């Protein structure tokens, strides 16, 4: 297992996200409740969890019907590895974007099947996990891009599915991320490079009829890309409807 990871591992197939404490407090409740409502067990990995995070995690666990588990790691990015001094904002942002892939092998070896998602995703309707060992979201590169950015935008990193017998793929993704550089799109670069070597008949390809950032009715997962997570009326309304945490406090302590 990865050095420094602690907490409770899942023991059943899960939807999985990873985040820091700020994003947990902002997005974890709607993510968990939306998964609960379609019967999917949940695992969340938290970097540098605060006491408020652990308090909220306990209440969310008590207020849901599905199994919800949490692991965590503690890290000072200013002194991580060979780095010394204030970490660049882009490198810090990239680390958190890559976080779920850094611990993916640990999680899938315990859970058997893992769908890794962004923490700001909402699960909008029931769905089955694929029958292949791997699932990912290929896409056309963004127009007018070249080099690193063009290569990175060939894959949407907001969804990635893996089964335990393909855990070496998770290891390869984590190892590629470890090579850096910690610039934006690193997670997508790692996915693109590793998945390129997997036979197509072993891979499920997702598209925007499954994971959707335009928030259309009938799609399975809504993902709050960029500012849309704050200013898109349709997404914000759905997020608020899923977020039953405030009433959970009353239910759990009454």
Spans of features found by a protein language model:
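A short, charged, and often flexible helix/loop element on the N-terminal side
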Residues: 75-98
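Catalytic core and acceptor-binding pocket of nucleotide-sugar-dependent glycosyltransferases
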Residues: 166-254
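Short, polar loop motifs at secondary-structure junctions
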Residues: 49-53, 119-127, 209-211
């Amino acid at each position: 297992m990865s050095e420094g990871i602690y907490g409770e591992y899942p023991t059943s197939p899960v939807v999985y996200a990873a985040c820091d404490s700020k994003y947990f407090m902002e997005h974890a409740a709607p993510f968990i409740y939306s998964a609960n409502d379609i019967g999917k067990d949940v695992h969340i990995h938290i970097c540098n969890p605060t006491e408020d995070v652990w308090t909220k995690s306990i209440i969310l666990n008590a207020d849901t019907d599905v199994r919800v588990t949490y692991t965590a790691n503690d890290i000072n990015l200013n002194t991580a590895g060979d780095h010394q001094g204030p970490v660049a904002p882009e490198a810090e942002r990239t680390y958190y974007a890559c976080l779920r892939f850094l611990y993916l092998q640990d999680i899938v070896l315990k859970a058997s099947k893992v769908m890794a998602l962004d923490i700001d995703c909402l699960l909008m309707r029931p769905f089955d996990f694929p029958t292949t060992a791997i699932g990912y979201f290929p896409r056309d590169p963004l127009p007018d891009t070249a080099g690193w950015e063009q290569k990175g935008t060939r894959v949407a990193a907001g969804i990635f599915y893996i089964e335990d017998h393909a855990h070496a793929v998770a290891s390869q993704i984590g190892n590629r991320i470890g090579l850096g550089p910690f610039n934006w799109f690193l997670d997508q670069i790692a996915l693109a490079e590793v998945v390129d070597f997997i036979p197509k008949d072993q891979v499920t390809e997702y598209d925007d009829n499954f994971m959707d950032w335009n928030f259309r009715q009938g799609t399975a997962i809504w993902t709050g890309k960029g500012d849309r997570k704050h200013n898109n009326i349709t997404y914000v309304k759905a997020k608020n409807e899923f977020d039953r945490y405030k009433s959970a406090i009353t239910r759990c302590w009454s």
